[in-house]
């Protein structure tokens, strides 16, 4: 199959998923072209500039494709004008709600209007979590296919031997409101350990810190199906996370991790402290989580599902 992938970036979150999926498809004999354009690196202009430039590039692209796959709403315009037999739009989380939390009312209003239009353009909509699927069904009466993003287990071989640091708690992610980093900082003085914040590290550095830690804290206010949780599962580091979005699809409380309410520094600190001293529970969580991610969230499991999804779409 011949693909055009469209994403504002090919790293982190949904962009990282787009990059990994493109690589997996290429390694399995499919052709994938990643549409890439520069965009203005100024707040509130990054996505609009990407939308304009990517749309123009898509219009003048003389190639034809079996499938144009866009990742997130800003990519939808380029998808709309792509010369492809079928078109797919993937969203990880509810776009309008994310913009509402992070930007002004005027920006949010425009984003929601664009979202409602863009959702009508593709032949198929996908998301990575049942939670996001449910919200879009309730809000827009639209059916999303759930195709979780996977982790590339081969990449973890790049991480060398790492010594565990007792009572180290780590945070991996952006320094942003929706990730709840401020909640962890409020809880930090009550945590009986050292908290390490990784907001701008290379992937290998971040994974090494996860591997060396006793706990990974995920204090998010909004999430779909966070890759950090899957990575921690694979690296045998227990996770304490908020019960928002798709996180409960990964973490079964007291089985594959610990769930706490969002926006509650005290309960977050208490859960972390309890797990730091309970080695039996920590070992149980590590074992269960590692089995779960290897059985459900690797490319060996997920790539055949993506390929079947594309093949079924083309034959429809």
Label for each model-derived stretch:
Residues 238-241:
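Short hydrophobic beta-strand element within catalytic cores of glycosyltransferases
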Residues 106-125:
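Membrane-proximal helix-turn-helix segments that form the acceptor-binding/catalytic region
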Residues 131, 150:
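Carbohydrate-associated surface elements
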Residues 253-254, 258-265, 274-280:
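Conserved acidic donor-binding segment of nucleotide-sugar-dependent glycosyltransferases
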Residues 221:
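Aromatic "clamp/platform" in nucleotide-sugar-dependent glycosyltransferases that forms part
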Residues 67-69, 82-100, 126:
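Active-site proximal beta-strand in glycosyltransferases
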Residues 274, 281-296, 305-308:
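A short, well-ordered alpha-helix in the C-terminal region of glycosyltransferases
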Residues 162-179, 185-188:
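Conserved donor-binding/catalytic core segment of Leloir-type glycosyltransferases
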């Amino acid at each position: 199959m011949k693909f055009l992938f469209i994403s504002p970036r090919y790293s982190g979150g949904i962009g990282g998923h787009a990059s990994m999926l493109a690589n997996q498809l290429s390694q399995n004999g499919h052709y994938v072209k990643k549409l890439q354009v520069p965009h203005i690196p100024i707040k509130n202009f990054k996505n609009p500039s990407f939308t304009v430039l990517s749309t123009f590039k898509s219009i003048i692209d003389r190639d034809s494709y079996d499938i144009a796959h866009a990742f997130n709403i800003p990519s939808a315009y380029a998808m709309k004008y792509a010369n492809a037999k079928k078109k797919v739009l993937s969203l990880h989380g509810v776009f309008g709600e994310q913009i509402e939390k992070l930007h002004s009312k005027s920006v949010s209003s425009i984003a929601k209007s664009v979202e409602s239009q863009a959702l009508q353009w593709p032949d198929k909509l996908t998301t990575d979590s049942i939670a996001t699927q449910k919200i879009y069904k309730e809000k827009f009466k639209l059916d999303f296919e759930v195709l979780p993003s996977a982790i590339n287990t081969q990449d973890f071989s790049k991480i060398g031997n790492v010594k565990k640091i007792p009572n180290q708690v780590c945070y991996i992610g952006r320094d942003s409101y929706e990730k709840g980093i401020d909640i962890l900082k409020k809880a930090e003085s009550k945590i009986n350990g050292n908290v390490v914040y990784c907001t701008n590290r290379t992937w290998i550095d971040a994974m090494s810190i996860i591997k060396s830690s006793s706990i990974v804290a995920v204090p998010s206010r909004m999430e779909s199906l966070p890759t950090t949780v899957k990575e921690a599962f694979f690296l045998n580091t227990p996770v304490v996370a908020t019960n928002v979005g798709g996180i409960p699809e990964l973490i079964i409380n007291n089985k594959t991790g610990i769930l706490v309410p969002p926006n509650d520094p005290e309960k977050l600190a208490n859960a972390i402290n309890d797990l730091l001293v309970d080695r039996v529970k920590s070992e149980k969580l590590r074992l269960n989580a590692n089995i779960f991610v290897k059985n459900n969230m690797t490319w060996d499991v997920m790539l055949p599902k993506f390929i079947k999804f594309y093949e079924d779409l083309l034959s429809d």
